[in-house]
């Protein structure tokens, strides 16, 4: 896999870890910074809930990861209603 460590800011990666057919989905959540990576498990619900384990990342980075996870969770019910898969396999975002 290519190097996901950015030269500036942070990359946030959610990778689905299991089936994607229910009202919840498990993800492996990782924050990549220029010199570190922080990983935790996450359970997202199509009611907009997002439960993340501790990442060990600075609070600001962890809070951004939680916000991204909640956005993905909130979109799940809408995607299902539109006839699309509710839980993406992989989501990658970069923030400064």
Task: Give, region by region, the residue ranges found by the protein language model.
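Amphipathic, interaction-prone secondary-structure segments
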Residues: 10-39
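Actinobacteria-biased recognition of intrinsically disordered, low-complexity terminal regions
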Residues: 1-15, 21, 92-96
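Extended Gly/Ser/Thr-rich low-complexity repeat segments
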Residues: 37-50
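Residue-level signal for the start and early helices of compact helical domains
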Residues: 3-5, 33-35, 85
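Acidic, low-complexity intrinsically disordered segments
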Residues: 49-96
């Amino acid at each position: 896999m290519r190097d996901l460590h950015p030269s500036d800011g942070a990359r946030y990666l959610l990778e689905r870890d299991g089936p994607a057919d229910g009202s919840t989905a498990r993800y492996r959540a990782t924050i990549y910074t220029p010199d570190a990576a922080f990983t935790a498990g996450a359970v997202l619900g199509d009611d907009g809930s997002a439960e993340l384990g501790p990442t060990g990342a600075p609070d600001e980075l962890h809070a951004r990861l939680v916000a991204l996870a909640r956005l993905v969770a909130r979109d799940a019910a809408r995607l299902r209603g539109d006839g699309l898969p509710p839980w993406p396999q992989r989501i990658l975002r970069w923030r400064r």
